[in-house]
Amino acid sequence: AYVNGKRLEKPESIDLQDAIISFNTLVMNDETIHGLNDASFSHRFIGSCGLDSIRVIKGQFGAHVNTNPKPWDIAAQFLFASELGLKMTTLDNMELDFSKAGPFIISNNACHEEVLGILNSGDGYKIQ
């Protein structure tokens, strides 16, 4: 994987408590938002699937959760994630299905399970 002719290094795995994560607060309920905010170092949301995901790919964010992607939103990110040893799954930790769109997470290995645990705790992942 390359950016501007320079090979990308595998991002360092950052524990969730030390990581900036990206998710859209407008589509998640308060319980989920507070759980993610409390567990992480900070929250930033750019609002572009590609721009939020590239922050994970470059090691600047620990995770990005997208709740309404289209197939073209996930293809390039998936290739980078595969090449760099990142995790990219559905929110129930299943392989992505490129024939349809659906919520996904791209993250480093240290954040993945903990973010999914928060998203799926209680009554499960909730959209307002």
Where are these regions (language model features)?
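An extended, acidic
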Residues: E9-Q128
